[in-house]
From Swiss-Prot:
UniProt-recorded name of the protein: RLA class I histocompatibility antigen, alpha chain 19-1
GO CC annotation: external side of plasma membrane; extracellular space; lumenal side of endoplasmic reticulum membrane; MHC class I protein complex; phagocytic vesicle membrane
PANTHER family per record: HLA CLASS I HISTOCOMPATIBILITY ANTIGEN, C ALPHA CHAIN, MHC CLASS I-RELATED
Region (Alpha-2): 115-206
Signal peptide bounds: 1-24
Length: 361
């Protein structure tokens, strides 16, 4: 079984995880297709992953022992058996189309067939909370670079270079934009609505983030404050650092939202602050799972002063008790020796005091 080169895996992963911005309360369905040529190892490897909102629900891999479109979400068990046969055939047909596309791109770019190349597409549709269509897209890439894309109006194409203009002319003559627009505005929306109904307990839930702020000294003069949001769903979230109530957008390092591995997501935002001014900075967290936005600050660890005072007081108390015991013993000894004359302290008396000192920590 051949393997996808690391660079291509990163491209595929970037496509799957760099989620397109969506409107609050909206839903989306997205597919990512990747074909990778591997000279001398047979047919190109072809992979499909499909997402509803931020949940992967189907996958196809031509390198599987028995290549079939596979279920990736529990709620997909509700579809009829013939669904999987139909989707598997579509995937296999598309794999052959992409094989041809790879060969065509080699000619357009005047490249040798000896190297490995990739051809990818991502497409999808988005609907409002009430199910109405409001956005669709379809984009293609070759060897990790933009190739051609359907414009926002879904009626025309934009080619990234002169090689892609060959494809643009061919597709314009064949009316490909109209065919894709019909799919995105109607069939894609119908399937998305159906999937949302089947998986509503998962897809339409709102898990609030668990948020906190960590402190990382960078130097004697500066420290990094990092605001964490963990375990939230859906993926849409806002993390904003403020200084004295003013947004610090330009000075904030913000990572892309990442899967947490358990069906939820993670994200953090960091800002570098002058040491000693940490309390002037607050992190504002907004997510649909929260009844109201969270406002967080860094909480310095509790100072050990109280603990030290308690230890010192305890030691002093022990010394006072020992001193009182020694005084009582001496008085009793003095009384017993008084019958025969003056009391003379024993030679080892100061060693008792020395023994008392040894109890000090």
């Amino acid at each position: 079984m051949g393997s996808i080169p690391p660079r291509t895996l990163l491209l595929l992963l970037a496509g799957a995880l760099t989620l397109k911005d969506t409107q609050a309360g909206s839903h989306s369905m997205r597919y990512f297709y990747t074909s990778v040529s591997r000279p001398g190892l047979g047919e190109p490897r072809f992979i499909i992953v499909g997402y509803v909102d931020d949940t992967q629900f189907v996958r196809f891999d031509s390198d599987a022992a028995s290549p079939r479109m596979e279920q990736r979400a529990p709620w997909m068990g509700q579809v009829e058996p013939e669904y999987w046969d139909q989707q598997t055939q579509i995937a296999k047909d598309t794999a052959q189309t992409f094989r041809v596309n790879l060969n065509t791109a080699l000619r357009y770019y005047n490249q040798s067939a000896a190297g490995s190349h990739t051809f990818q597409t991502m497409f999808g549709c988005e609907v409002w909370a009430d199910g109405r269509f409001f956005h669709g897209y379809r984009q293609y890439a070759y060897d990790g670079a933009d190739y051609i894309a359907l414009n926002e109006d879904l009626r025309s194409w934009t080619a990234a270079d002169t090689a892609a203009q060959n494809t643009q002319r061919k597709w314009e003559a064949a009316g490909e934009a109209e065919r894709h627009r019909a799919y995105l505005e109607r069939e894609c929306v119908e399937w998305l609505r159906r999937y949302l109904e089947m998986g509503k307990e998962t897809l339409q839930r709102a898990d609030p983030p668990k948020a906190h702020v960590t402190h990382h000294p960078a130097s004697d003069r500066e420290a990094t404050l990092r605001c964490w949001a963990l375990g939230f769903y859906p993926a849409e979230i806002s993390l904003t650092w403020q200084r004295d109530g003013e947004d610090q957008t330009q000075d904030t390092e913000l990572v892309e939202t990442r899967p947490g591995g358990d069906g939820t997501f993670q994200k953090w935002a960091a800002v570098v602050v002058p040491s000693g001014e940490e309390q002037r900075y607050t992190c504002r967290v907004q997510h649909e799972g929260l009844p109201e936005p969270l406002t967080l600050t860094w909480e310095p660890p509790a100072q050990p002063t109280a603990l030290i005072v308690g230890i010192v007081a305890g030691v002093l108390g022990v010394l006072l008790i020992l001193g009182a015991v020694v005084a009582v013993v001496r008085r009793k000894k003095h009384s017993s020796d008084g019958k025969g004359g003056r009391y003379t302290p024993a030679a080892g008396g100061h060693r008792d005091q020395g023994s008392d000192d040894s109890l000090m920590p």
